[in-house]
Amino acid sequence: MILKRILFLFTSVTLLAGCSSGRAPEIRAICLRDDIGNYIIKWETDPHTDGMMKLYVSDTPNSFDMSQPCGYANINDGRVTYITNDNITRKYFLLSFNDKYYRTVGARSVQMDSVQNLRDIGGYFSEHGNRMTGWGKIFRSGELKALSRNDTIRLDNLKIKTVIDLRGEDEVALAPEKYTGANIISIPIPVKGKEQIARRLEEGRIRKGDGLVYMQDTYISYVTDESEQFGKALKVFLDKDNYPILVNCSLGKDRAGFLTAMLLTALDVPEETIMKDYMASNNHIDLRHLAYMARNLNTDAQETITVLLGADETWLDLAFHKIKKEYGSTDKYLSKGLHLTEKERDTLKDIILHLSLIHISEPTRRVVIS
């Protein structure tokens, strides 16, 4: 069981998953960043709740100074903006509803200058009970081959201890990770057939639909050929001393996407949520420089490149179908294909999941989230 402590200036209480007098409200919250970099926090409560929401801010997701809220809003307003000119230090927020119920939330995306698709996978609800993935524990991204000075500072501020590099050996040799502040664990999963498709693109021999077929074959191969490597990567998450962990590949969408999907599956996160996380790569990959490189290619080649650089739910769905066809269920794939035992799944849940809603009923100086 993982204990995360949030120190309170005022007296606090014992934590409960529910309310001693009636049902605890269901509180959903989301944090976004606008074009300037300000944080926009939105929430909904069910049932409808009146009263005051107090907002607290911290550089870490599990320790908040409660001496002074950074913002207030009527609960019915459903949103508040935290204005900042700090685009280096990542912020997390604690929402207090009537000084009784508390939710933590962070922005999904981490702003970077030279790293594609860096995201926090905290805040995803498990199917069972009042638990969600913890913020600031696991990140996913593209390769770290080029880092600005600010990017290095941002990664340092995330306190990344371990980077799981899923790129093939040839990719690593051409573009080694530049971040030196973490332990790099290389678990190579090669991109098969990339030389052939690159040659056909250059020679103008690519046909409409070739990119789609190539990506479908890639995702099937994750199940048929690369389960050993993905299973090895999952074992890294079993050691709590490895956290926070960053999983990456070239763009952070395919190999990192499949591994993240399997990890979330092991945590009993609903498949619909897993698919949304996977598809979010389309919103966090900057294709402008790649589009410039493809400007002189024919229409079919440009379309193929667009396909190769995106995420398509049919690809991950195809992998899930292959898993269920070959193994009968995702649970059996986790145990037989990825060699993850039920006890190890419980360990992952103890490390990564925590209470999504904190209920405070009696005064105390410390809140313990378990």
Regions found by a protein language model. Give the residues of each.
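Sec-dependent signal peptide recognition
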Residues: 3-9
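Bacterial N-terminal signal peptides
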Residues: 9-17
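Substrate/cofactor-recognition hotspot
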Residues: 252
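Short cysteine clusters
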Residues: 249
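Single conserved hydrophobic/aromatic residue that forms the stacking wall/gate
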Residues: 358-370
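Alpha-helix capping/helix-boundary segments
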Residues: 12, 169-170, 366
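Cys-dependent protein tyrosine phosphatase-like superfamily
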Residues: 20-246, 259-357
